[in-house]
Each structure stands twice: as C-alpha cells, then as structure tokens.
C-alpha cells in the first residue's frame, strides 16, 4: 500500500498565499483610510458648490434661459453695544413754507435744542430774524420743475418736500445715524425720539413712523405709509439708497397726492416696509386732543402734529403757551410723559385715570382698565361726515350717563424733589359746568386739586412695555387728592379689591 505523500508547508504556491493573507489587512486598512479622505474632500467640495449654486439666479426671457450669478451675501454689521444713539447723531429735515414761517417757527423753537442738527427747507427765502440762533439752519429746496405732477387735488410742493431727506443727506454731515422728517407744525419730544431709535440697528435699512388716526386716510393712502407730519425716521444706509434712486422713482408717480406717499412708493421699490412706532402722531383729527393724549399707548410720546388744526392741549391759553406748559414735565421726566395709569378710590367708588404730566380724571363709578385705555371721543374725524367707525382704533363715548362725565384736572405746575428723588405735579380742576347728578355717592367736584408723586425712571423703555400702577393715598388736605404713580409691585393688579 502506498502512502500518500505528506503535504509540505513550504510549497511555492502556499508561500504566495501566505504573503497575500499577511498584507491584505494592511491593504484593506489603507483603502478604507483613502476612501474616507476622498469622501470628506468631495463632501466639502459639494457643500461649497451647493452654496455657490444658491447664488445663481436663472431667468427665462423670450424662451432663452439666462443665468446671473448674485454676489455672495454680506454679513450684517453688528451695532456696538457701547455706542448708544445720541441726539447729535439724528439730523432733522423740516418742511416749511415762507408764507407760514413767521408763525410756525414758534413751534420749532419750543422743542429745538442747541446740540441738535437739522435744516428747515423752505420754498423761498425769508428775512433773517433775531431768533435765528434758536432755530435750525434754513435752506431753500432745489428746483423740481423737471418732475411731472398731475394730481388735480394736490399741490406740486409735495415733490419738493419728498426730496428733503435726500437733500439733507447730500449736505455730507458726519456721524449721522438717522434722518428724521417732520413739518413746521410738528412738535417733537427729542429725548423720546432717541429712546425709540436706539432700539434699532442704524446700520440696517429702517423706515420708522406711524399711520393716520383716520381709517379713511389710511384707505385712501396706505396703512403701510409713514405720515410725514407725524414724523418718520430713515436710517443712514437707507437714506443713501433712497438718494440714489429717488429722482427716477418720483418720475414714475406723477399722480400721487403728497410727499409722504411718494416716499412710501420709493420705499416699496427698495423693498423696505414701515416699522410702526405708536409714539409718532399725525393727529388727523379736529377738536380736543384730551381723549387721545390722556389714553396714550404704552410707548414713548415722540411727536404731535397739526397744532394749528386742533385746540390748545391746555385750556385757557394759546397753542404756544400750552406747549410751553408741556415742556415742564418733559424737562422733568420725558420718558413718563402722557403715560396712563388707572386706579380706584374704593371708599368713594371712583375710577381715577392719570396721564402723567398732563391730566388727572375722576369718574363716578368703577370702570375697567380695558375701557379706560380706549380714547374718549373728545375729537372729531378728519372727514366731517364720518362717525366713530371712521377712526383707525377703538374709541369710547365721553360719557354714557350724565353722572359719569369725568372731572378733569390739568397740570398747573411740577417740580423735582431731590431728597425724595421724585417729581411732584399739581393738577387743578378745569372749571366747567357739570350736569346735576342724583346718584347717592361722593361728588368729585369737591376735589379742587390733585397731587401726583412719581419717581423718575430714565430706563423705563429699556424694559418690556408695561403700564405703571397708581395708588390713591390717604390725606388730611381738604379738597385734595394725593396719588402715587410708579412701577407695579409684585402681584399688583389694576383692580378694585
């Protein structure tokens, strides 16, 4: 029997296989590493090419495809947190006419300050005055005869006025963050304007203002338009963009009525919407502003317009005298101006509404805050045939019953107590005839004066908006009510308890 030959381990082909199995793990590991590197490379490359593709805009014109490459997005510059906007960095452009200058310059003098910058743009020259140092610089607007104007109800001066921001920009003033447009019959509260604009990044495109109080005005023009009389603000970069295209833009809208709708049309072409701030007031109303001012929104009061159309805001004085009176609380605590607080006199069942720096009103009976924060209709609509539904906000009647007619106390004087760190304002009853009331309850007519105490809070608007609380304090002073106004305490609610 033959034995099978022994299989030896050192056959040539076996040595080859052994070498193969020895090097295979190394080869496999190298391959995996190479593939991983290639995957990472192609992933990054594909991501970059995808991002580039996002900037490619494809359009088809007449059956022919055109490709345009948009520039890569530019990162937005961030505002410096240590650099707050100052009054010096706001430049005003004020629309005025030579015909009304001698009268309306008196309004501007009431709010203009020496450290401010701006220009009054006139349609023609006026004589120098001894009070020129109390006013902004005066300039004559550029020629607008080349622009078409064919609105039969308006006036072509609207074109001149619409170009004021652009003309002011071209003066080349340095360190400008905002341009603010206003009329010669607009009263500004400058410190509150600074507070409002400081909320926004001046390096971005901003168009800030508010709409009309008249629903019909907003329908006829636009709810998205800033009304120029109430004032509006345009950031510096947006003003530069506007100046580059405005003359072309104006030519496309010869049928528009005014200046502010022309600005709005150009803003629409620039793609910039209106940022609404409720403190800018066009006041397209007639009559008494008491109802509007005493129920001011929870926002800084920035402007009051149509001073010649409405009654003086304080009775028994002319308009200039009334605004001088308003400057008293503005100089003490402008942040709190016109801010409404509501509280209750429980023992006498009265509702008390305080509009700081302006009025105190006492009502017989208990009214909810929800009702009190609605303006009472002491004013008339811009369109004489329109009723209360013609307003662009909720309103309420002045009174629903003869016994609920408010007793109004207007600011007479105010001062600051350094020791107590609080303002003290005195309000005196406005003497008007009140109807006889047969209700068996305390009569507010016996209150002749109201004292209001409040600690100034310059950082009031650096916090989320909230209405202040007021409290009726006990007093032994005959014929006097004493009220404390301030930040609502923990768990404090405006309610009768």
Q: Each PLM stretch: what is its role?
A:
Residues 189-190, 227-246:
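Conserved nucleotide-sugar donor-binding
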Residues 2-71:
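N-terminal signal-anchor transmembrane helix specifying type II single-pass membrane topology
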Residues 188-219:
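Conserved donor-nucleotide/metal-binding helix-loop-beta segment in metal-dependent transferases, i.e.
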Residues 178, 219-233:
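A recurrent flexible, glycine/aromatic-enriched loop bordering the glycosyltransferase active site
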Residues 3, 26-44, 57-60, 255, ...:
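C-terminal catalytic/acceptor-binding lobe
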Residues 121-177, 191:
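Active-site-proximal specificity loops/subdomain of glycosyltransferases
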Residues 175-185:
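Short beta-strand-to-loop acidic/aromatic patch adjacent to the donor-nucleotide binding site
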Residues 84-87, 107-118:
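Short, acidic, metal-binding catalytic loop of nucleotide-sugar glycosyltransferases
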